[in-house]
From Swiss-Prot:
Gene Ontology molecular function, alphabetical: ATP binding; guanylate kinase activity
Organism per entry: Aster yellows witches'-broom phytoplasma (strain AYWB)
Domain of life: Bacteria
Family: Belongs to the guanylate kinase family.
Known role: Essential for recycling GMP and indirectly, cGMP.
Keywords of the record: ATP-binding, Cytoplasm, Kinase, Nucleotide-binding, Transferase
Name by which UniProt lists this protein: Guanylate kinase
Keyword Oxidoreductase set for record: no
Coiled coil regions in record: none
Domain Guanylate kinase-like stretches: 7-187
Cellular compartment(s): Cytoplasm
One GO cellular component term noted in the UniProt record for this chain: cytosol
PROSITE patterns with a match to the protein in the record: GUANYLATE_KINASE_1, GUANYLATE_KINASE_2
Length: 211
C-alpha cells in the first residue's frame, strides 16, 4: 500500500547573524531527504558569493512593492530599509509534491506566518550559544557598517524575547549539531499522531489473513 505523506513547511528563523543559511546548507548536505529551499526575495544588494535565484531573488524596491500589491508573497517585512518576503506560488507547488520546504526568514516575517495558522508548519528558532557570538559573526561578514551592526544587535535583543512562541529552539553551537537536531525534529513531527493517523488507519484496513 502506498502511504500518503504531506510535506512540512519548516520555518527556520532567528536573529540576523545566527547562521540560518549556514545551518540549512549543512543540513541539505547531510541527508538525501526530500528537502527543498524556498528562495526568498529581497531588495538588499547581494553579498559576495550570493547568486540571484539561488540565495535570494534580488528585486528593486518597485518590483517588490508591485508584488505586495498583487498578493504574491506569503509574508513580507521591512528590515533596516530593505524588504524581505516569501514568494507564495513556489511553496504551494513544493508542498503539493510532498516535499519538505525550508524557509529562512526574519523573526518579523515568522510572526506574520504564525498568525496565518497554516497547517503542517513547524517553527524553529535558531539561537547562538552567547549573544556576543552574534556581534562577532556580523563583524566577520565584513558587509555591514558598525552602525548597522549595532541596529541588528538591538533588534536581536527584542527578538530573543519571542523565542517561546516557536515550536522548537535550536542552539547553533556547532553547525553539524544544529543540523542534526533539526533533522530529528522533522522526523518527530512526521511521527506525531495528527500527521500519521490516516496512514495508520489505512494499514488497519488491510486484511493480513486474506487468502
Amino acid at each position: 500500500m502506498k502511504l500518503n505523506k504531506k510535506g512540512l513547511l519548516i520555518i527556520l528563523s532567528g536573529p540576523s547573524g545566527v547562521g540560518k543559511a549556514t545551518v540549512r546548507k549543512a543540513l541539505f548536505e547531510m541527508t538525501n531527504h526530500n528537502f527543498v529551499y524556498s528562495v526568498s526575495a529581497t531588495t538588499r544588494k547581494p553579498r559576495p558569493g550570493e547568486q540571484d535565484g539561488k540565495d535570494y531573488h534580488f528585486l528593486t524596491k518597485e518590483e517588490f512593492e508591485k508584488g505586495i500589491e498583487n498578493n504574491c508573497f506569503l509574508e513580507w517585512a521591512k528590515f533596516i530599509d530593505h524588504y524581505y518576503g516569501t514568494p507564495k506560488k513556489q511553496i504551494q507547488d513544493f508542498l503539493k509534491q510532498g516535499k519538505e520546504v525550508f524557509l529562512e526568514i526574519e523573526v518579523e516575517g515568522a510572526t506574520h506566518l504564525r498568525k496565518k495558522r497554516m497547517p503542517n508548519t513547524v517553527f524553529i528558532f535558531l539561537v547562538p550559544p552567547k549573544k556576543k557570538d552574534l556581534y562577532d559573526r556580523l563583524k566577520k561578514r565584513g558587509t555591514e557598517q558598525e552602525i548597522n551592526i549595532v541596529q541588528r544587535i538591538a533588534k536581536a535583543n527584542n527578538e530573543f524575547r519571542l523565542a517561546h512562541k516557536y515550536d522548537y529552539i535550536v542552539v547553533n553551537d556547532e553547525v553539524a549539531n544544529a543540523a542534526d537536531r533539526i533533522i530529528a525534529i522533522i522526523r518527530a513531527e512526521h511521527a506525531k499522531t495528527k500527521r500519521s493517523i490516516r496512514n495508520y488507519l489505512k494499514i488497519l484496513e488491510d486484511n493480513v489473513y486474506a487468502e
